[in-house]
């Protein structure tokens, strides 16, 4: 994609269309993942540099109906996972601890097209996750990110997420863990 399919706009959220991912989206999702991997590498962030997430993981997300696609003017510009099935690696947290032990949504694998970065799309994904929580009667969202992913950590703070400590992934890597009580 040569450019993001919109110029500077004030109401980006009103222009985005969210839908569940399908098998036909896997190629584009992998392009978005490659964009994110490249961006992380340029920022010297050791996140997604080991081939994660794989095509198999993305396919599993789609089969599990937890992958979401973000379209703008019919073009896929972002993807994310929003799940209500918990996260095993969140069972042990070092630091402050989770705000509560309520049922929660978890957001994973946010990837935005390079040309659409810094347009507020990741923020809209998190708003969408909050809306899904409200629809399902779930009052909490948890998310984790790499300690060097300053952009995501800053966004989470601005959006009212509380830093709760560190979790350990199955790979042994640490991630900074955040929690928000949805109103």
Regions found by a protein language model. Name each.
Residues 17-31:
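A short beta-loop-alpha structural element at the N-terminal edge
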Residues 37-57:
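Conserved GNAT-fold acetyl-CoA-binding loop/helix
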């Amino acid at each position: 994609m040569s450019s993001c399919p919109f110029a500077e706009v004030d109401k980006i959220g009103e222009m985005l269309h969210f839908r569940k991912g399908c098998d036909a989206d896997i190629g584009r999702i992998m392009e978005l993942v490659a964009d994110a991997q490249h961006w992380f590498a340029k920022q010297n962030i050791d996140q997604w540099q080991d081939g994660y997430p794989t095509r198999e993981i993305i396919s599993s997300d789609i089969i599990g109906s937890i992958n979401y696609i973000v379209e703008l003017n019919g073009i896929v510009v972002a993807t994310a996972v929003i799940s209500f099935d918990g996260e095993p690696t969140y069972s042990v947290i070092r630091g402050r601890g989770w705000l509560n032990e309520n049922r929660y949504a978890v957001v994973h694998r946010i990837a935005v097209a390079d040309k659409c970065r810094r347009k507020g799309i990741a923020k809209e994904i998190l708003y969408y996750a909050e809306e899904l929580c409200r629809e399902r009667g779930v009052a909490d969202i948890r998310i984790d990110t790499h300690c060097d992913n300053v952009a995501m950590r800053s966004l989470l703070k601005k959006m009212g997420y509380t830093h709760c400590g560190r979790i350990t992934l199955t790979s042994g890597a640490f991630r900074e863990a955040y929690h928000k009580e949805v109103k």
